[in-house]
Amino acid sequence: VRANRCLKGWLDFRGNCYGYFRQELPWRKAEAWCRVVRGGCHLASIHTSEEHRAVAKFISQCRRGEEGDDVWIGLYHWNKSWSWIDGSKMHYSAWDDDDFSKGQYCAALEDSSGFLSWEDDACSERNAFICKCAA
C-alpha cells in the first residue's frame, strides 16, 4: 500500500494531484492561487478522456450535487491559439461547440454538462477552479 502523495482532499490520478477550490476567482487570480497552494501547481491541464472523466467525477463529488458555476482549467487563448498554462501540448479537447464568443479567452469545465465539456468564458469571470501538480 503506497501513501497518498497528494494533499488531503485532493484527487490522486496517474501521478498527478488535483485540488478543487470553491472560491470564485477570475482566471489569472485562480492560476496565481494554484501556484501558491503548492509548488509546481497550475490550473489543471487535461490531456485524455480518462483524465477528464476522473476530474469531472472528482468535482461532482466535491460539489455534492450543489448547483454552481463553471470551473476554470488552465487553458487560455493567446496569439490566435489555445495553450495550456503549464506549457504542455494540447492533444485533447472537449469543446461544447466551436462557436467561440469574441473576447472570451479562457476555458472552463461547464457545470451544466457535469463538467464533461469545455466552454470559453471571459477571463474576468469569477469561477471555481481546479489545480493540478505532479504527485
UniProtKB/Swiss-Prot annotation:
Disulfide bonds: C6-C17, C34-C131, C106-C123
Compartment annotation: Secreted, Extracellular space, Extracellular matrix
Subcellular location, principal: secreted
Coiled coil: none
Keywords noted in UniProt: Disulfide bond, Extracellular matrix, Lectin, Secreted
A GO cellular component entry from the record: extracellular region
SMART domains referenced in this protein's UniProt entry, alphabetically: CLECT
GO MF: carbohydrate binding
Residue intervals of the C-type lectin domain: 13-132
UniProt-listed InterPro entries: C-type_lectin-like, C-type_lectin-like/link_sf, C-type_lectin/snaclec_domain, C-type_lectin_CS, CTDL_fold
UniProt keyword Transcription regulation present: no
PANTHER family: MANNOSE, PHOSPHOLIPASE, LECTIN RECEPTOR RELATED
Full protein name: Rheacalcin-1
Provenance organism: Rhea americana
